[in-house]
């Protein structure tokens, strides 16, 4: 799949100050005022990735997520045809409340859009999948710097050679997000993120990116490149963009996903998903 590193323009720093509550973020998406990444917005609240598939594939995809809980932890699911997921928020519309979407046909992206109302069908089932942006607040609270947040860009994401556990028509390579950290911070990040298994949990890989098929850290498959300094390690977490890699392999007749880095900000608090 071609790189999408330039798909979205990063917001200015004052954008983050404007969107401190989940509803404010969703309303900005709904109105078209927000079309960029959501990292750092509405601190303390869970963010989610999106995969929307026809009802005939929903059970199969749910089984795939069950087999692959690290990259695909389902935190909410709609009824067929419904664009509401009440467990994640009452004033919430799956069709409009992400800053950006991708529309897929037969495994190919046919549209990038800020609103999928015109594409919605009565047979569609929406899956909201936990996102690592949710645990970033906990990392920053411990003083761990996150370069993509500091620079107002999307976290870099890579299609690795790590294979997901297949389920029916769904199989493929796992996508991982990467954050550069000095060794002491990497150790602390492992300790912190272990508490959040429903938003990907602890890292799956640290250092030596070539062992998971990442040849160039400055050329992410999704998101934006950030440099890794000589005293830092690349730390990789399972990523909720994995369904997009899998959809490209499975080639369903129709699907909708979020644009990488452009998440749903829910009304659920990060602390609700912590286990320790």
Curated annotation (Swiss-Prot):
SUPFAM superfamilies attached to this UniProt entry: PSTPO5379-like
Cysteines joined through disulfide linkages: none
Keyword check for Lyase: yes
Name of protein: Putative hydro-lyase Xaut_1503
Similarity comment: Belongs to the D-glutamate cyclase family.
Catalytic activity, EC: 4.2.1.-
Gene Ontology MF annotations: lyase activity
Highest taxon listed in the record's lineage: Bacteria
Keywords: Lyase
InterPro entries: D-Glu_cyclase, Putative_hydro-lyase, UPF0317
Gene3D superfamilies noted in UniProt: PSTPO5379-like, PSTPO5379-like domain
Pfam families (UniProt xref): D-Glu_cyclase
């Amino acid at each position: 799949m071609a790189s999408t590193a330039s798909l979205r323009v990063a917001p200015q720093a004052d954008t983050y100050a404007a969107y401190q509550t989940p509803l404010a973020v969703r309303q900005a998406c709904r109105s078209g005022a927000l079309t960029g990444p959501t990292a750092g917005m509405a601190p303390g609240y869970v963010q989610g990735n999106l995969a929307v598939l026809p009802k005939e594939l929903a059970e199969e995809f749910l089984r795939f997520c069950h087999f692959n809980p690290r990259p695909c932890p389902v935190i909410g699911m709609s009824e067929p045809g419904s664009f509401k997921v009440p467990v994640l928020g009452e004033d919430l519309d799956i069709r409009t409340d992400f800053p950006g979407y991708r529309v897929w046909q037969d495994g190919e992206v046919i549209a990038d859009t800020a609103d999928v109302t015109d594409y919605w069908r009565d047979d569609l089932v929406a899956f909201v999948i936990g996102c690592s942006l949710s645990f970033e607040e906990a990392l920053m609270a411990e003083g761990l710097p996150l370069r993509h947040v500091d620079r107002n860009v999307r976290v870099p994401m890579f299609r690795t050679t790590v294979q997901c556990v297949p389920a029916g028509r769904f199989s493929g390579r796992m996508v991982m997000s990467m954050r550069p950290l000095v060794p002491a911070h990497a150790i602390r990040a492992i300790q912190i993120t272990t508490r959040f298994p429903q938003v990907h949990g602890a890292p799956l890989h640290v250092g030596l990116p070539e062992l998971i098929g990442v040849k160039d850290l400055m050329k992410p498959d999704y998101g934006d490149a950030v440099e890794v300094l000589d005293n830092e390690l690349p730390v990789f977490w399972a990523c909720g963009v994995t369904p997009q890699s899998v959809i490209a392999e499975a080639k369903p007749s129709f699907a909708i996903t979020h644009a990488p880095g452009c998440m749903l900000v829910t009304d659920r608090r990060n602390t609700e998903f912590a286990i320790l």
